[in-house]
Design a protein with these regions (language model features):
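DNA-recognition helix of helix-turn-helix
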Residues: 131, 137-161
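Sigma70-family region 2
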Residues: 29-46, 64-66
Length: 163
C-alpha cells in the first residue's frame, strides 16, 4: 500500500525539508508509522493517506530541525534536469537559460510560506486532486484552492520579470 506512492512521498518530503538526506529520513520514519498503523487504519484513498503521514512526519521533523539554509546546487535532481535540458536543447544558450529558469522556479517554490509550498508541491508536482490535498492536510477544499491561488500569484510575482 505504501510502495506505489513512495516516489510521491519522497518528492513531497524533499520539498518540505529542502534536501535529499532529510527527505530520506522523513520518508523512512513515515513508512515506519504507516506500517505500524496499517492494521488499524481504514484507508479509502491510499495515496492521500501515505502523503498525509509524510506531511505530518515532515512537519514534526521541521519543528525539531529547522534547516538553516537550502543549497539547491547540490541537488542531484536539479543537476540531472539541467543535464537533460543541455542534452535536448539545440544550443548551449538555450540549455543555460532552461537550467537557470528551473533553478529560479525551485528557489521561488522553496521561498514560499510552508502552507503555500505544500499545496503547490502536492498539486502541481505530485498531481494530487484538490480533494486528496484537502484530506492530506486536514483543510477544506476551498482552503486548498485559495492557498494554491495565492501561492501561484506569489510565484508569478517572483518570477514575472523572467518571462
Amino acid at each position: 500500500m505504501v510502495l506505489p506512492h513512495l516516489d510521491d512521498a519522497y518528492g513531497l518530503a524533499r520539498w518540505l525539508t529542502g534536501n535529499q538526506t532529510d527527505a530520506e529520513d522523513v520518508v523512512q520514519d513515515a513508512c515506519m508509522r504507516a506500517l505500524a498503523s496499517l492494521e488499524t487504519a481504514i484507508i479509502e484513498r491510499p495515496r492521500a493517506w501515505v502523503l498525509t503521514i509524510v506531511r505530518n512526519t515532515a512537519l514534526n521533523w521541521l519543528a525539531k530541525n529547522r534547516p538553516k539554509a537550502v543549497v539547491l546546487t547540490d541537488d542531484p535532481q536539479v543537476l540531472d534536469a539541467a543535464a537533460a535540458h543541455r542534452d535536448s536543447a539545440p544550443d548551449p544558450e538555450e540549455a543555460l537559460i532552461a537550467a537557470a529558469d528551473e533553478a529560479a522556479l525551485q528557489s521561488a517554490i522553496q521561498a514560499l510560506p510552508h502552507l503555500f509550498r505544500e499545496v503547490v508541491v502536492m498539486r502541481d508536482i505530485n498531481g494530487m486532486s484538490y480533494r486528496e490535498i484537502a484530506a492530506a492536510i486536514g483543510a477544506p477544499q476551498g482552503t486548498v484552492m485559495s492557498r494554491l491561488a495565492r501561492a501561484r500569484a506569489q510565484l508569478v510575482e517572483k518570477l514575472g520579470s523572467r518571462a
